[in-house]
Amino acid sequence: VLLNRVESPTVAALWNNNAQRLVEGIGLGIPANNSSDPRHRAAANEEYTLGAGGDISRWPGSIGLAASFDPELVREFGEIASIEYRALGIATALSPQIDLATDPRWSRFKGTFGADPDLATDVARAYVDGFQTSSKAQEIQEGWGYESVNAMVKHWPGGGTGESGRDAHYGYGAYGVYPGKNLKEQILPFSEGAFKLKGQTKMASAVMPYYTISYDQDSVNGENVANAYNKYLITDLLRGT
């Protein structure tokens, strides 16, 4: 179900509760999992900000958060945002976007934590910790609890590597070419950041591969196929990280 706006946080919570009741009746014990792209940008828009009744807090976008050079501030943002997500019935954040901003021509440049791999790694870790960790009375087990939201880091193995800055949502952006032959650098925000948290949840709970074909990056099988179908990139490199 794609739901892109609601009347108010109350309506969103009621909608979520009704969806949960529906799946509980199926008897398989699998809950509904409502997810959302980032909702806290400073600019108000109908879908993400006004679409939640206008009550959600507003923050700088990802590139702005990174420009603070303050991972602790980003962690605090994650804590606040996760509480608001849960109030709306959202259990999974389709964020953070932790691609390195390799090419300024890329249309999703502003959704990254910038070009510096060390800064992007630290901010990615803080963001995921903030979203996923519940503490004190809100914790149920191992850092997870009533204020936890699954963080889906994206885009493995680096979405800022498109040929000439073209975006892979479109056919003309099919190839990730990794200027500078820097695959290892591109995955640092994943391997050293989102997968090595300071909090008890330990690592990001979900990963979204990018839609590119990471050209000539498969050093084992030599396959040039979409990232999600590349055994080396997914089974060997991602799951082995």
Report the location of each language-model feature.
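Glycoside hydrolase catalytic-domain context in secreted enzymes
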Residues: 1-241
